[in-house]
Amino acid sequence: MDAHTEGTALPLISQMRSRVESILLVVDSPASVEALARALDAETTVVSDVLRSLQGELTERGSGIDLRETPEGWRFYTRKENADAVEQFVLDGT
C-alpha cells in the first residue's frame, strides 16, 4: 500500500507552481517576478502569490531548500542550518 491509498499523500500542486519550481531549479542568478511572469505568460500577482506560498511551505516543513527573495529576485538556496553538511559534501568531492 502506498501513501496515495492510505490518504496521506501530499496534495497535488498547480501547473503554475510546478513550472515556477522548475525554472528556479535551473537559474544561475535570482529571477525577478517580472521575468518569471513573462516566461510563464502570467500576471505578476499570480507568480508572486505562488512564490510566497512556496516559500512559506518550504519553511513550515523544515525543508533543506530555502526560497529567498533578494533585491535581484527569487532563487533556491540551501538552508543555513545545513551549511556544515553541504560544505563537507562539496569539500570531500563526494
Question: What function would you assign to each model-found segment?
Answer:
Residues M1-M16:
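Phosphate-centric recognition/catalysis
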Residues S18-S22:
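Pre-recognition alpha-helix immediately N-terminal to the DNA-recognition helix
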Residues V26-S32:
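Short capping segments at the starts of secondary-structure elements
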Residues S32-A39:
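A short acidic, leucine-rich amphipathic alpha-helix
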Residues A39-D41, G73:
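Short, charge-patterned binding micro-sites
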Residues E43-S53:
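Short amphipathic alpha-helical interaction segments
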Residues L54-T94:
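Short basic alpha-helical hairpin corresponding to helix-turn-helix/winged-helix-like nucleic-acid-binding
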